[in-house]
Amino acid sequence: MIEQMRQLIQLIAKHNHAYYVMDQPTISDSEYDHLFHQLKALEEQYPELVQADSPTTKVGGQALSKFESVTHVVPMLSLGNVFNQEDLFAFARRVEERLPNQKVQYEVELKLDGLAISLWYENGVLVRGVTRGDGETGEDITQNVKTIRNLPKVLHSEKYEIPRLLEVRGEVLMPKSGFEKLNADQEAKGEKTFANPRNAAAGSLRQLDPNIAAARPLAFYAYGIAQCEPNHGLTTMHDSLQWLTELGFQIAERQYLCNSIQEVQQRYEQIQQERPNLQVEIDGMVVKVDDLKQQQQLGFLSREPRWATAYKFPAQAALTTVEQIDWQVGRTGTLTPVARLNPVFVGGVTVSNVTLHNIGEIHRLDVRIGDTVSVYRTGDVIPKVEKVWPEFRPAEAEVVHLPESCPVCASPVVMPEGEALARCSGGLYCAAQRIEAIRHFVSRKAMDIEGLGDRWVESLLRLDLLKDVADIYHLHEHRETLLGIEKMGEKSVQNLIDAIEASKKTTLARFIYALGIRGVGETTARMLANTFQTLEALKAANVEALKKTPDVGDITAEWIADFFLAPHNIEVLDRLIAAGIHWDAPTAPTRQPLNGESWVLTGTLEQMTRDQATQMLQALGARVSGSVSSKTKCVVAGEKAGSKLEKAAKLGIPVMNETDFLSLMAGYGQTLS
């Protein structure tokens, strides 16, 4: 146990140094809180093992030598945390038990996510600015704080006498708008950008050259008074903040005086909703006993006041463990790894599953089954694994490998070189791809089965009548079942059966396109049909033969070959042909007049549709492209043609209007049908 405690102490010390001294946080606040509370729980369970250097009795790290060290007369302690309503009410019970028979009011403020500093004024003149440092000793950053525009260098008030000595505590931060502009400027200059506004504020404030700080959009928000001589005579926290505004200080844009802890909870929910619209970053709210005498009665623990706590928003990041990594198969056959997590509450929801996207991301993170990971979520953003903690990795942690076969249908998994995504090769057979495969197969440009829409498909899948696309051609055997589907009468069923029967007569190009082979669109399907002439020849083609086909590159050739190598796909193909799908036998190939030419259609066509123009061009051997290049043979331009027309003129590509195009097509025997 002591070894685990030492490990946590060292880890927290490392992150304390990064946060408090270097101003370069390496983990989120919630991740730090998790480590801190883990250590605190162990110390409460084993008090005899508490170490002298435990961070539970301190605030942060040591000051850097590049700034003069300053000892705080009144230590700058940190706050305890609560994370939910139950914790908040427990805080209130502890407060009220120590203040029996007293009315307690609570001052609620925004918990600003900035850099805590202390400001010293003598006779109203700013004489020193000091960072919190480790709570006992900070760094003198006076020259830099004097450059902050909204921070008063000399105090003025028409209502109050300026005290001889005043120590004000507050946060230096960078408003969101200023942060965005700073990062844009940094990027334009080719310099490093900042990860978040807090890092930007801290980095700016601790520059040795005050001119750099002066150029940064920093702001100071006061949140309390550490010392005042003579005493200001104020009795509440709320009045103290208003007094500071009279002296020229800016305070956070929302403060609430609450008469009960229930009202505090209501304000918490309100602030949480308003958070995205605030001009500054916050990570919760601060709840303080308002009465200053009651604060004195309550006193302090070793590192935090008993009279105040930070009520944190749901963590945007949290630590948990990876219990398992499963592979899901999407509608297009993509294999996606999903981490099954020990459930953790983060960003307002309980997260138990997180996508890892692909095998490359698994390798980049080096995430293994059994690892401790940071899960990040903010707003409506999908949760993600942001970091792996190798220092917590158990000896039995399992390395994750890409599966060789599909977890759904056992077809081979393929991942062409240079591709980030692995896919199941069982396109026609795989149950995970069934809906997408059927939807594509019946579409107008494929088998064109009119009436077999999504509603029909979903009903047929529920009834287990469609396991793959070949089952479509056996639906007539289940007529009575079809008639039992809601809103499917005799006429609808007969129309569907007739449309399925009519689709059996097709073309080889349409059939190839209908198979849904990755990378094979209409044009590629037509090129394959023209090149190989028969389905058997296409099935037997190797990668090298496929690569010789116009419009087929190296990767597409591999996808086609993999498709026809999968036994399950061949089984479905055989059933489709056995069901009666057929096309005219190929005739002796003749050279087409526009063979291999690239044409482009642009603008609004009025005498024909784009599909009609495309079909006529393809029938003559041309390829229709979406962009103009030096290889373009001709551009057909309709009304309101734009950039493509301009590019054609620049490259000297011939341009033809609709009327001339239709005349040319008629000369080749192609007319609008």
UniProtKB/Swiss-Prot annotation:
Gene Ontology BP annotations: DNA repair; DNA replication
EC number, UniProt record: 6.5.1.2
Domain of life: Bacteria
SMART domains membership: BRCT (SM00292), HhH1 (SM00278), LIGANc (SM00532)
Domain called BRCT: residue spans: 589-673
InterPro entries xrefs: BRCT_dom, BRCT_dom_sf, DisA/LigA_HHH, DNA_ligase, DNA_ligase_AS, DNA_ligase_CS, DNAligase_adenylation, DNAligase_N
Keyword NAD listed: yes
Name used for this protein in its record: DNA ligase
List of residues binding Zn(2+): 406, 409, 424, 430
